[in-house]
Amino acid sequence: MSATDPTVVLGTIGSDAHAVGITLLDHALREAGFTVHNLGAQTAKTEFATAAADHDADAVLVSSLYGHAQQDCAGLHDQLAAAGVDATTVVGGNLAVGQTDFETVKQRFEEMGFDRVFSAQTGFEAVVDAVKTELDVDERSPTTTTLGA
């Protein structure tokens, strides 16, 4: 990868221990030409902010599947700003317990400052394409992911 590849920081926030989704998204982003810093599961907001600053991230992608993303993400944008990070922010997963109306959940996260909000049903390619759009990245390679090859 070249030094000009867009850089993303990726992780599962708070006490959420789900890591399979971010691992698959990591692969899809790398195949699409991104430099990825995967923080893994159970990542604190301060770790996202520090990593984004340290790696001069173009985007910060936050995953949460256990339904408590609103509580876990509260204050994330303040911490990013305090660290001098001006990056696109994306959140996705099962963001709210008993989530039935995704549009309401999406609006809540947009009001928190997220540039893109995705449900757990969103495919990895759609997320990669949205990040490319947000960062105005030219097509570099297909965004399909082949596992086990």
UniProtKB/Swiss-Prot annotation:
<keyword id="KW-0170">Cobalt</keyword>
<dbReference type="Pfam" id="PF02310">
    <property type="entry name" value="B12-binding"/>
</dbReference>
<comment type="pathway">
    <text>Amino-acid degradation; L-glutamate degradation via mesaconate pathway; acetate and pyruvate from L-glutamate: step 1/4.</text>
</comment>
<comment type="similarity">
    <text>Belongs to the methylaspartate mutase GlmS subunit family.</text>
</comment>
<dbReference type="GO" id="GO:0031419">
    <property type="term" value="F:cobalamin binding"/>
</dbReference>
<dbReference type="InterPro" id="IPR006394">
    <property type="entry name" value="GlmS"/>
</dbReference>
<keyword id="KW-0479">Metal-binding</keyword>
<comment type="subunit">
    <text>Heterotetramer composed of 2 epsilon subunits (GlmE) and 2 sigma subunits (GlmS). GlmE exists as a homodimer and GlmS as a monomer.</text>
</comment>
<feature type="binding site" description="axial binding residue">
    <location>
        <position position="18"/>
    </location>
    <ligand>
        <name>adenosylcob(III)alamin</name>
    </ligand>
</feature>
<keyword id="KW-0846">Cobalamin</keyword>
<feature type="binding site">
    <location>
        <begin position="94"/>
        <end position="98"/>
    </location>
    <ligand>
        <name>adenosylcob(III)alamin</name>
    </ligand>
</feature>
<dbReference type="GO" id="GO:0050097">
    <property type="term" value="F:methylaspartate mutase activity"/>
</dbReference>
<dbReference type="GO" id="GO:0046872">
    <property type="term" value="F:metal ion binding"/>
</dbReference>
<comment type="function">
    <text>Catalyzes the carbon skeleton rearrangement of L-glutamate to L-threo-3-methylaspartate ((2S,3S)-3-methylaspartate).</text>
</comment>
<dbReference type="InterPro" id="IPR006158">
    <property type="entry name" value="Cobalamin-bd"/>
</dbReference>
<feature type="binding site">
    <location>
        <begin position="15"/>
        <end position="19"/>
    </location>
    <ligand>
        <name>adenosylcob(III)alamin</name>
    </ligand>
</feature>
<feature type="binding site">
    <location>
        <begin position="63"/>
        <end position="65"/>
    </location>
    <ligand>
        <name>adenosylcob(III)alamin</name>
    </ligand>
</feature>
<protein>
    <recommendedName>
        <fullName>Glutamate mutase sigma subunit</fullName>
        <ecNumber>5.4.99.1</ecNumber>
    </recommendedName>
</protein>
<feature type="domain" description="B12-binding">
    <location>
        <begin position="5"/>
        <end position="138"/>
    </location>
</feature>
<dbReference type="GO" id="GO:0019553">
    <property type="term" value="P:glutamate catabolic process via L-citramalate"/>
</dbReference>
<keyword id="KW-0413">Isomerase</keyword>
<dbReference type="GO" id="GO:0019670">
    <property type="term" value="P:anaerobic glutamate catabolic process"/>
</dbReference>
<dbReference type="InterPro" id="IPR036724">
    <property type="entry name" value="Cobalamin-bd_sf"/>
</dbReference>
